[in-house]
Swiss-Prot record:
Subunit structure of this chain's protein: Interacts with YIH1.
InterPro entries: Ribosomal_eL39 (IPR000077), Ribosomal_eL39_CS (IPR020083), Ribosomal_eL39_dom_sf (IPR023626)
GO CC entries: cytosolic large ribosomal subunit
Keyword Lipid biosynthesis tagged: no
One annotated GO molecular function: structural constituent of ribosome
KW Ribonucleoprotein (keyword) present: yes
Lineage start: Eukaryota, Fungi, Dikarya, Ascomycota, Saccharomycotina
Family: Belongs to the eukaryotic ribosomal protein eL39 family.
Pfam (any one): Ribosomal_L39
SUPFAM superfamilies, per the entry: Ribosomal protein L39e (SSF48662)
Single Gene Ontology BP annotation: translation
Key words of the record: Ribonucleoprotein, Ribosomal protein
Protein name: Large ribosomal subunit protein eL39
Gene3D superfamilies associated with the record: Ribosomal protein L39e (1.10.1620.10)
Amino acid sequence: MAAKKSFIIKQKLAKAKNQNRPLPQWYRLKTNNKIRYNAKRRHWRRTKLGL
């Protein structure tokens, strides 16, 4: 990644960073909750963003 990034690229990186986190524990404790984990987690080395 270049040191000089355009603002659009920086925004996309920030969004990807925010999306790449586990589910909050309080959300798992909700009644009738079927979701156990974040299926869209991304590992920095395995899957690239394709920017």
